[in-house]
Swiss-Prot record:
CDD domains: IHF_B. One of its GO terms (biological process) is regulation of translation. Keywords: DNA recombination, DNA-binding, Transcription, Transcription regulation, Translation regulation. This protein is one of the two subunits of integration host factor, a specific DNA-binding protein that functions in genetic recombination as well as in transcriptional and translational control. This is Integration host factor subunit beta. It comes from the Bacteria. Coiled coil: none annotated. The gene is ihfB. GO terms for molecular function: DNA binding; structural constituent of chromatin.
């Protein structure tokens, strides 16, 4: 689902709210999550999951095209861990 599809579904579910207001709310929520991660904070949405940063150590990588070794610096990457309720909802037993 894309951000625009999410906004369309929210507009259909809440027809009394203007589409522009829904768009602004979705953008604000995503911006708040991004800012929190940028500040090094963890964001937890109970029943859904949590967003945090994982820190990658510097390492020696390889250029796949040339095969040359490349030094990769340390970096932080966003990480999402699904909550118990979300895991239970998507765990479809075949």
């Amino acid at each position: 689902m894309t951000k625009s599809e999410l906004m369309e579904k929210l507009s259909a579910k809440q027809p009394t709210l203007p589409a522009k207001e829904i768009e602004n709310m979705v953008k604000d929520i995503l911006e708040f999550i991004s800012q929190s991660l940028e500040n090094g904070d963890r964001v937890e949405v109970r029943g859904f999951g949590s967003f945090s940063l994982h820190h990658r150590q510097p390492r020696l990588g390889r250029n796949p095209k040339t095969g040359d070794s490349v030094n990769l610096s340390a970096k932080s990457v966003p990480y999402f861990k699904a909550g118990k309720e979300l895991k239970a909802r998507v765990d479809v037993q075949a």
